[in-house]
């Protein structure tokens, strides 16, 4: 008897669940109808004007003049030969010490502040 009660409650629960899902679906459809009435062109596929379609098919290369100038600069850089780094130039390998630095030259012009 208890198994029958359990199955009855499960069926009632599933029925209520189905009813609530149907109500939600009806509400959503109602909202969609309201929106379509308010904004009729919203659900259509984007077609646009003939001018827009022509521009899209053409395949615009540059977004603005900055993109054009950057592409132009890249073209110039490819044409120029790139000089390799100087092999005799040492950068960052040697840490100078006070003994390695050349002596400071004294200034010919004397300061007016020094008494």
Curated annotation (Swiss-Prot):
GO terms for molecular function: phosphatase inhibitor activity; protein phosphatase 2A binding; protein phosphatase inhibitor activity; protein phosphatase regulator activity. GO terms for cellular component: cytoplasm. Pfam families: Endosulfine. GO terms for biological process: cell division; G2/M transition of mitotic cell cycle; mitotic cell cycle. The keyword Cell membrane does not apply. Keywords: Cell cycle, Cell division, Cytoplasm, Mitosis, Phosphoprotein, Protein phosphatase inhibitor. Coiled coil: none annotated. Residues 1-10, 104-115 have a biased composition (Polar residues). InterPro entries: Endosulphine. Residues 1-27, 77-115 are annotated as: Disordered. The modification Phosphoserine is found at residue 65. It is found in: Cytoplasm. Protein phosphatase inhibitor that specifically inhibits protein phosphatase 2A (PP2A) during mitosis. Belongs to the endosulfine family. This is Alpha-endosulfine. The lineage of its organism: Eukaryota, Metazoa, Chordata, Craniata, Vertebrata. The gene is ensa.
């Amino acid at each position: 008897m208890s198994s029958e009660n359990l199955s009855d409650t499960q069926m009632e629960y599933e029925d209520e669940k189905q009813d609530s899902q149907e109500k939600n679906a009806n509400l959503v459809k109602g909202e969609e109808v309201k929106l379509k009435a308010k904004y009729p062109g919203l659900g259509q596929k984007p077609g646009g004007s003939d001018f827009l379609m022509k521009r899209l098919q053409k395949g615009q290369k540059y977004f603005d003049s900055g993109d054009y100038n950057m592409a132009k600069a890249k073209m110039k850089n490819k044409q120029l030969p790139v000089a390799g780094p100087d092999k005799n130039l040492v950068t960052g390998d040697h840490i100078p010490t006070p003994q390695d630095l050349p002596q400071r030259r004294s200034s010919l012009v004397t300061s007016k502040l020094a008494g």
